[in-house]
Amino acid sequence: MKTYYEQDANVGLLQGKTVAVIGYGSQGHAQAQNLRDSGVEVVVGVRPGKSFEVAKADGFKVMSVSEAVRTAQVVQMLLPDEQQAHVYKAEVEENLREGQMLLFSHGFNIHFGQINPPSYVDVAMVAPKSPGHLVRRVFQEGNGVPALVAVHQDATGTALHVALAYAKGVGCTRAGVIETTFQEETETDLFGEQAVLCGGVTALVKAGFETLTEGGYRPEIAYFECLHELKLIVDLMYEGGLTNMRHSISDTAEFGDYVTGSRIVTDETKKEMKRVLTEIQQGEFAKKWILENQAGRPTYNAMKKAEQNHQLEKVGEELREMMSWIHAPKELVKK
Protein backbone atom coordinates (compact mmCIF):
# COMPACT_ATOMS: atom_id res chain seq x y z
CA MET A 1 0.00 0.00 0.00
CA LYS A 2 1.53 3.28 -1.13
CA THR A 3 0.88 6.14 1.29
CA TYR A 4 1.99 9.74 0.80
CA TYR A 5 2.75 12.28 3.52
CA GLU A 6 3.78 15.93 3.79
CA GLN A 7 7.31 15.35 2.48
CA ASP A 8 5.94 13.56 -0.59
CA ALA A 9 3.86 16.48 -1.86
CA ASN A 10 4.65 20.02 -2.99
CA VAL A 11 1.78 22.48 -2.76
CA GLY A 12 4.05 24.88 -4.63
CA LEU A 13 2.97 23.10 -7.81
CA LEU A 14 -0.32 24.98 -7.45
CA GLN A 15 1.32 28.38 -7.08
CA GLY A 16 0.53 30.59 -10.04
CA LYS A 17 -2.44 28.39 -10.88
CA THR A 18 -6.11 28.81 -10.13
CA VAL A 19 -8.23 26.01 -8.70
CA ALA A 20 -11.93 26.05 -9.54
CA VAL A 21 -14.10 24.32 -6.95
CA ILE A 22 -17.36 23.40 -8.66
CA GLY A 23 -20.06 23.23 -6.03
CA TYR A 24 -20.07 24.75 -2.55
CA GLY A 25 -21.70 22.15 -0.36
CA SER A 26 -20.09 20.29 2.50
CA GLN A 27 -16.92 19.18 0.70
CA GLY A 28 -16.86 22.25 -1.52
CA HIS A 29 -16.72 24.79 1.26
CA ALA A 30 -14.19 22.76 3.26
CA GLN A 31 -11.79 22.07 0.42
CA ALA A 32 -12.02 25.60 -0.97
CA GLN A 33 -11.27 27.23 2.39
CA ASN A 34 -8.43 24.83 3.23
CA LEU A 35 -6.82 25.46 -0.16
CA ARG A 36 -7.11 29.22 0.31
CA ASP A 37 -5.51 28.97 3.75
CA SER A 38 -2.67 27.02 2.11
CA GLY A 39 -1.98 29.92 -0.23
CA VAL A 40 -3.77 28.57 -3.30
CA GLU A 41 -5.81 30.83 -5.58
CA VAL A 42 -9.38 29.51 -5.52
CA VAL A 43 -12.52 30.45 -7.41
CA VAL A 44 -15.92 28.87 -6.86
CA GLY A 45 -18.19 27.85 -9.70
CA VAL A 46 -21.87 27.54 -8.78
CA ARG A 47 -25.21 28.54 -10.17
CA PRO A 48 -27.12 31.46 -8.59
CA GLY A 49 -28.77 30.45 -5.34
CA LYS A 50 -27.99 29.76 -1.72
CA SER A 51 -24.54 28.21 -2.31
CA PHE A 52 -23.58 31.16 -4.52
CA GLU A 53 -24.39 33.61 -1.74
CA VAL A 54 -22.66 31.54 0.95
CA ALA A 55 -19.46 31.27 -1.10
CA LYS A 56 -19.55 34.99 -1.79
CA ALA A 57 -20.04 35.75 1.91
CA ASP A 58 -17.04 33.53 2.66
CA GLY A 59 -14.92 35.85 0.55
CA PHE A 60 -14.50 33.82 -2.62
CA LYS A 61 -14.65 35.02 -6.18
CA VAL A 62 -17.83 33.30 -7.34
CA MET A 63 -18.78 32.81 -10.97
CA SER A 64 -20.67 30.54 -13.30
CA VAL A 65 -19.38 27.01 -13.75
CA SER A 66 -18.39 27.77 -17.35
CA GLU A 67 -16.39 30.84 -16.38
CA ALA A 68 -14.72 29.01 -13.49
CA VAL A 69 -13.55 26.23 -15.81
CA ARG A 70 -12.18 28.77 -18.29
CA THR A 71 -10.38 30.59 -15.47
CA ALA A 72 -8.73 27.62 -13.77
CA GLN A 73 -5.96 25.14 -14.41
CA VAL A 74 -7.37 22.64 -11.89
CA VAL A 75 -11.11 21.93 -11.82
CA GLN A 76 -12.48 20.03 -8.81
CA MET A 77 -15.98 18.58 -9.33
CA LEU A 78 -17.73 18.63 -5.95
CA LEU A 79 -21.35 18.53 -7.03
CA PRO A 80 -23.59 15.61 -5.98
CA ASP A 81 -22.97 12.49 -8.08
CA GLU A 82 -26.36 12.68 -9.76
CA GLN A 83 -25.78 16.28 -10.93
CA GLN A 84 -22.25 15.98 -12.22
CA ALA A 85 -22.84 14.44 -15.65
CA HIS A 86 -25.42 17.05 -16.65
CA VAL A 87 -23.32 19.99 -15.46
CA TYR A 88 -20.23 18.51 -17.08
CA LYS A 89 -21.97 18.22 -20.45
CA ALA A 90 -23.62 21.63 -20.23
CA GLU A 91 -20.87 23.80 -18.73
CA VAL A 92 -17.57 21.98 -18.27
CA GLU A 93 -16.77 19.87 -21.32
CA GLU A 94 -16.68 22.59 -23.96
CA ASN A 95 -14.50 24.82 -21.77
CA LEU A 96 -11.77 22.31 -21.00
CA ARG A 97 -8.40 22.91 -22.61
CA GLU A 98 -5.17 21.01 -23.02
CA GLY A 99 -3.14 20.47 -19.85
CA GLN A 100 -5.92 21.14 -17.34
CA MET A 101 -6.66 18.75 -14.49
CA LEU A 102 -10.17 17.49 -13.82
CA LEU A 103 -10.43 16.36 -10.20
CA PHE A 104 -13.07 14.38 -8.32
CA SER A 105 -13.64 13.32 -4.72
CA HIS A 106 -15.63 10.23 -5.70
CA GLY A 107 -15.13 8.05 -8.75
CA PHE A 108 -18.78 7.27 -9.58
CA ASN A 109 -19.18 9.26 -12.78
CA ILE A 110 -15.79 8.39 -14.25
CA HIS A 111 -15.92 4.71 -13.34
CA PHE A 112 -19.45 4.19 -14.64
CA GLY A 113 -18.87 6.19 -17.82
CA GLN A 114 -21.20 9.10 -17.12
CA ILE A 115 -18.34 11.55 -17.68
CA ASN A 116 -15.79 10.89 -20.44
CA PRO A 117 -13.12 13.61 -20.39
CA PRO A 118 -11.05 14.38 -23.49
CA SER A 119 -7.65 12.73 -23.77
CA TYR A 120 -5.77 16.02 -23.41
CA VAL A 121 -6.65 16.66 -19.75
CA ASP A 122 -5.46 14.97 -16.57
CA VAL A 123 -8.15 13.14 -14.60
CA ALA A 124 -7.49 12.38 -10.93
CA MET A 125 -9.20 11.96 -7.59
CA VAL A 126 -8.51 13.28 -4.10
CA ALA A 127 -11.11 11.81 -1.74
CA PRO A 128 -10.95 12.92 1.92
CA LYS A 129 -12.30 10.14 4.14
CA SER A 130 -14.37 12.45 6.32
CA PRO A 131 -17.41 14.69 5.90
CA GLY A 132 -16.70 18.27 4.93
CA HIS A 133 -17.17 19.87 8.33
CA LEU A 134 -14.46 17.58 9.75
CA VAL A 135 -12.14 18.23 6.81
CA ARG A 136 -12.34 21.92 7.69
CA ARG A 137 -12.28 21.68 11.48
CA VAL A 138 -9.37 19.25 11.69
CA PHE A 139 -7.39 21.42 9.24
CA GLN A 140 -7.97 24.50 11.40
CA GLU A 141 -6.70 22.53 14.40
CA GLY A 142 -3.42 21.97 12.56
CA ASN A 143 -4.09 18.39 11.55
CA GLY A 144 -5.68 16.65 8.58
CA VAL A 145 -7.96 13.78 7.64
CA PRO A 146 -6.76 10.79 5.60
CA ALA A 147 -7.58 10.69 1.90
CA LEU A 148 -7.40 8.50 -1.16
CA VAL A 149 -5.64 9.55 -4.36
CA ALA A 150 -5.99 8.04 -7.83
CA VAL A 151 -5.04 8.93 -11.38
CA HIS A 152 -7.41 7.89 -14.16
CA GLN A 153 -5.72 9.73 -17.01
CA ASP A 154 -2.24 11.28 -17.08
CA ALA A 155 -2.10 13.53 -20.12
CA THR A 156 0.68 15.78 -18.82
CA GLY A 157 2.84 13.23 -17.04
CA THR A 158 2.44 15.18 -13.79
CA ALA A 159 -1.08 14.18 -12.74
CA LEU A 160 -0.10 12.35 -9.56
CA HIS A 161 2.18 15.18 -8.42
CA VAL A 162 -0.52 17.81 -8.95
CA ALA A 163 -3.14 15.65 -7.22
CA LEU A 164 -0.82 15.24 -4.23
CA ALA A 165 -0.22 19.00 -4.20
CA TYR A 166 -3.99 19.45 -4.03
CA ALA A 167 -4.24 16.86 -1.23
CA LYS A 168 -1.57 18.75 0.70
CA GLY A 169 -3.41 22.02 0.19
CA VAL A 170 -6.54 20.46 1.67
CA GLY A 171 -4.47 19.13 4.60
CA CYS A 172 -4.75 15.42 3.90
CA THR A 173 -1.03 14.67 3.63
CA ARG A 174 -0.76 15.59 7.32
CA ALA A 175 -2.59 12.33 8.05
CA GLY A 176 -1.68 10.26 5.00
CA VAL A 177 -2.95 9.84 1.45
CA ILE A 178 -3.39 6.28 0.20
CA GLU A 179 -3.02 5.52 -3.50
CA THR A 180 -5.94 3.65 -5.07
CA THR A 181 -7.87 3.46 -8.35
CA PHE A 182 -11.18 4.96 -9.43
CA GLN A 183 -12.60 1.44 -9.62
CA GLU A 184 -11.52 0.43 -6.13
CA GLU A 185 -12.66 3.66 -4.50
CA THR A 186 -16.03 3.66 -6.22
CA GLU A 187 -16.96 0.03 -5.70
CA THR A 188 -15.79 -0.19 -2.08
CA ASP A 189 -17.41 3.14 -1.20
CA LEU A 190 -20.78 2.08 -2.60
CA PHE A 191 -20.56 -1.34 -0.96
CA GLY A 192 -19.67 0.13 2.43
CA GLU A 193 -22.59 2.56 2.26
CA GLN A 194 -25.13 -0.02 1.17
CA ALA A 195 -24.16 -3.15 3.07
CA VAL A 196 -22.70 -1.76 6.28
CA LEU A 197 -22.64 1.95 7.08
CA CYS A 198 -26.08 3.03 5.89
CA GLY A 199 -28.22 0.20 4.56
CA GLY A 200 -26.88 -2.49 6.87
CA VAL A 201 -26.89 -0.45 10.08
CA THR A 202 -30.30 1.15 9.57
CA ALA A 203 -31.90 -2.20 8.75
CA LEU A 204 -30.30 -3.77 11.84
CA VAL A 205 -31.41 -0.93 14.12
CA LYS A 206 -34.99 -1.05 12.83
CA ALA A 207 -35.18 -4.84 13.09
CA GLY A 208 -33.94 -4.73 16.68
CA PHE A 209 -36.34 -1.93 17.61
CA GLU A 210 -39.29 -3.75 16.03
CA THR A 211 -38.37 -7.05 17.70
CA LEU A 212 -38.46 -5.43 21.14
CA THR A 213 -41.65 -3.43 20.59
CA GLU A 214 -43.43 -6.43 19.07
CA GLY A 215 -42.30 -8.38 22.13
CA GLY A 216 -44.22 -5.98 24.36
CA TYR A 217 -41.39 -3.67 25.43
CA ARG A 218 -41.87 0.09 25.50
CA PRO A 219 -40.68 1.94 22.37
CA GLU A 220 -38.63 4.37 24.46
CA ILE A 221 -36.59 1.56 26.01
CA ALA A 222 -36.20 -0.13 22.63
CA TYR A 223 -34.90 3.14 21.18
CA PHE A 224 -32.25 3.49 23.87
CA GLU A 225 -31.06 -0.11 23.49
CA CYS A 226 -31.04 -0.31 19.69
CA LEU A 227 -30.18 3.20 18.48
CA HIS A 228 -29.10 5.66 21.16
CA GLU A 229 -26.33 3.48 22.59
CA LEU A 230 -25.03 2.64 19.12
CA LYS A 231 -22.90 5.80 19.12
CA LEU A 232 -21.13 4.70 22.30
CA ILE A 233 -20.12 1.42 20.69
CA VAL A 234 -19.17 2.93 17.33
CA ASP A 235 -16.99 5.56 19.03
CA LEU A 236 -15.04 2.80 20.79
CA MET A 237 -14.53 0.94 17.50
CA TYR A 238 -13.58 4.19 15.75
CA GLU A 239 -10.93 4.93 18.37
CA GLY A 240 -9.33 1.49 18.62
CA GLY A 241 -11.04 -1.18 16.55
CA LEU A 242 -13.17 -4.12 17.64
CA THR A 243 -10.68 -5.17 20.32
CA ASN A 244 -10.86 -1.76 22.00
CA MET A 245 -14.65 -1.90 21.97
CA ARG A 246 -14.73 -5.38 23.48
CA HIS A 247 -12.18 -4.39 26.11
CA SER A 248 -14.38 -1.46 27.13
CA ILE A 249 -17.75 -3.20 27.47
CA SER A 250 -18.86 -5.61 30.19
CA ASP A 251 -17.86 -9.27 30.02
CA THR A 252 -21.55 -10.13 29.75
CA ALA A 253 -21.90 -7.92 26.67
CA GLU A 254 -18.69 -9.29 25.18
CA PHE A 255 -19.80 -12.92 25.62
CA GLY A 256 -23.15 -12.07 24.06
CA ASP A 257 -21.26 -10.52 21.14
CA TYR A 258 -19.33 -13.74 20.51
CA VAL A 259 -22.21 -16.20 20.78
CA THR A 260 -24.99 -14.17 19.14
CA GLY A 261 -23.47 -11.93 16.47
CA SER A 262 -23.03 -14.73 13.95
CA ARG A 263 -26.67 -15.76 14.46
CA ILE A 264 -27.79 -12.33 13.27
CA VAL A 265 -25.28 -11.76 10.48
CA THR A 266 -25.29 -15.29 9.09
CA ASP A 267 -23.58 -17.03 6.19
CA GLU A 268 -26.69 -16.19 4.17
CA THR A 269 -26.20 -12.52 5.03
CA LYS A 270 -22.65 -12.67 3.72
CA LYS A 271 -23.86 -14.37 0.54
CA GLU A 272 -26.31 -11.52 0.05
CA MET A 273 -23.49 -9.04 0.63
CA LYS A 274 -21.56 -10.72 -2.17
CA ARG A 275 -24.58 -10.37 -4.44
CA VAL A 276 -24.78 -6.68 -3.58
CA LEU A 277 -21.08 -6.30 -4.40
CA THR A 278 -21.57 -8.06 -7.73
CA GLU A 279 -24.44 -5.71 -8.61
CA ILE A 280 -22.18 -2.75 -7.86
CA GLN A 281 -19.26 -4.18 -9.85
CA GLN A 282 -21.45 -4.90 -12.87
CA GLY A 283 -22.94 -1.41 -12.83
CA GLU A 284 -26.47 -2.55 -11.95
CA PHE A 285 -26.80 -0.20 -8.98
CA ALA A 286 -25.36 2.72 -10.96
CA LYS A 287 -27.85 2.12 -13.77
CA LYS A 288 -30.72 1.89 -11.28
CA TRP A 289 -29.71 5.17 -9.58
CA ILE A 290 -29.22 7.00 -12.88
CA LEU A 291 -32.64 5.88 -14.16
CA GLU A 292 -34.23 6.77 -10.82
CA ASN A 293 -32.98 10.35 -11.15
CA GLN A 294 -34.07 10.58 -14.78
CA ALA A 295 -37.58 9.52 -13.73
CA GLY A 296 -37.81 12.17 -11.00
CA ARG A 297 -36.95 9.87 -8.07
CA PRO A 298 -40.37 8.28 -7.45
CA THR A 299 -39.03 5.23 -5.58
CA TYR A 300 -36.44 7.26 -3.67
CA ASN A 301 -39.02 9.81 -2.52
CA ALA A 302 -41.60 7.19 -1.52
CA MET A 303 -39.10 5.16 0.48
CA LYS A 304 -37.68 8.28 2.12
CA LYS A 305 -41.14 9.38 3.26
CA ALA A 306 -41.96 5.92 4.62
CA GLU A 307 -38.70 5.75 6.57
CA GLN A 308 -39.22 9.21 8.06
CA ASN A 309 -42.62 8.09 9.36
CA HIS A 310 -41.28 4.97 11.10
CA GLN A 311 -42.15 4.75 14.80
CA LEU A 312 -38.44 4.72 15.63
CA GLU A 313 -38.10 8.25 14.25
CA LYS A 314 -41.09 9.59 16.16
CA VAL A 315 -39.91 8.11 19.46
CA GLY A 316 -36.37 9.31 18.89
CA GLU A 317 -37.48 12.86 18.22
CA GLU A 318 -39.31 12.95 21.56
CA LEU A 319 -36.46 11.39 23.54
CA ARG A 320 -33.81 13.69 22.08
CA GLU A 321 -35.74 16.62 23.53
CA MET A 322 -34.63 15.28 26.94
CA MET A 323 -30.95 15.37 25.94
CA SER A 324 -29.73 18.95 26.13
CA TRP A 325 -26.22 17.91 25.13
CA ILE A 326 -27.41 16.77 21.71
CA HIS A 327 -27.47 19.69 19.31
CA ALA A 328 -29.84 18.52 16.61
CA PRO A 329 -29.53 20.49 13.37
CA LYS A 330 -32.32 22.97 12.70
CA GLU A 331 -32.06 22.10 9.03
CA LEU A 332 -31.02 18.74 7.63
CA VAL A 333 -28.03 19.10 5.31
CA LYS A 334 -26.04 16.68 3.19
CA LYS A 335 -22.65 16.12 4.78
UniProtKB/Swiss-Prot annotation:
Gene transcribed to yield this protein: ilvC2
All residue ranges annotated as the KARI N-terminal Rossmann domain in the record: 1-180
Positions that bind NADP(+): Y24, G25, S26, Q27, R47, S51, D81, E82, Q83, Q84, G132
PROSITE patterns given in the database record: KARI_C, KARI_N
GO CC terms of this entry: cytosol
Keyword Oxidoreductase attributed: yes
Annotated residues for binding of Mg(2+) 2: D189, E225, E229
Active-site residues, Swiss-Prot/TrEMBL: H106
Protein family: Belongs to the ketol-acid reductoisomerase family.
GO molecular function, one term: magnesium ion binding
Documented EC number(s): 1.1.1.86
Cofactor binding, note field: Binds 2 magnesium ions per subunit.
Protein purpose: Involved in the biosynthesis of branched-chain amino acids (BCAA). Catalyzes an alkyl-migration followed by a ketol-acid reduction of (S)-2-acetolactate (S2AL) to yield (R)-2,3-dihydroxy-isovalerate. In the isomerase reaction, S2AL is rearranged via a Mg-dependent methyl migration to produce 3-hydroxy-3-methyl-2-ketobutyrate (HMKB). In the reductase reaction, this 2-ketoacid undergoes a metal-dependent reduction by NADPH to yield (R)-2,3-dihydroxy-isovalerate.
Pathway: Amino-acid biosynthesis; L-isoleucine biosynthesis; L-isoleucine from 2-oxobutanoate: step 2/4; Amino-acid biosynthesis; L-valine biosynthesis; L-valine from pyruvate: step 2/4
Reactions that this protein is recorded to catalyse: (2R)-2,3-dihydroxy-3-methylbutanoate + NADP(+) = (2S)-2-acetolactate + NADPH + H(+); (2R,3R)-2,3-dihydroxy-3-methylpentanoate + NADP(+) = (S)-2-ethyl-2-hydroxy-3-oxobutanoate + NADPH + H(+)
HAMAP family listed in its UniProt record: IlvC
Protein name, entry field: Ketol-acid reductoisomerase (NADP(+)) 2
